[in-house]
Amino acid sequence: ACCEKVFEYAMPVEQAAETVVPDTMPDVERILCAEGTVIIRSKEVNEGRVSVSAGVAATVVYSPEGGGAPCRVSAAVPVELELDAPGVTQESIPVAMLTLTGIEARMLNPRKLLVRAVISAQVECYAQTEMSFCDGLEGDGAEDVEVLSDSRTISPVVSVKERTFVVSDEYRLAPGMPAMGELVWHGVDINTGSVRAVGTKIVYSGTVRMSVLYEAAETGELASGSFETEFSQMIDTATDLSSPDCS
């Protein structure tokens, strides 16, 4: 058994949303920066259709009118993909990879912001199928036909699985860094490491790199820090991967 790719989509997607500064926060004088993280909520397949529901959790840091410490406001930018997908059925397996490639914030007025995000969207769908090979001729007269044989290496997809897990850790600020007051922003990058097959399972490792921007407790000035956490996880593919050719 293997998994055949029956649909593929790769395009940049641009979405925007307005957000209002809460009443408890001062007016915006100048936008300092904007950051965000893409969160996929759901993936659905129907006959000839693929739907992906996601959103960008954005953070905008700005200077308040009249001076003072920088302020932070959160914004949600919805991302909805409705794709025509010939060949896709309700039994197809959807895979979605959304990457934030750009984000910016613009002041519409001192109490309202426009946040625009650009996302690289990659959506694929797979169908369970069987591989078949022809290794010769059969039937009347087949013995009179000369057949040239050769060897080829193929790499079929034998399983498509996903797993959600949580990585948590506690960090200490590096020596010399000011004590943390309010957390202004944080961002996360995930880098995969080794991947190996053990029976029907895939064992994989990686590193979570987190960057933070915060207000110093005593001075209110902005400071930044970075931290790393390694992880190791396992996922069951329900497929025998003991062959040395599996990767």
Task: Label each PLM-derived region with a short phrase.
Residues A1-S247:
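Viral structural modules
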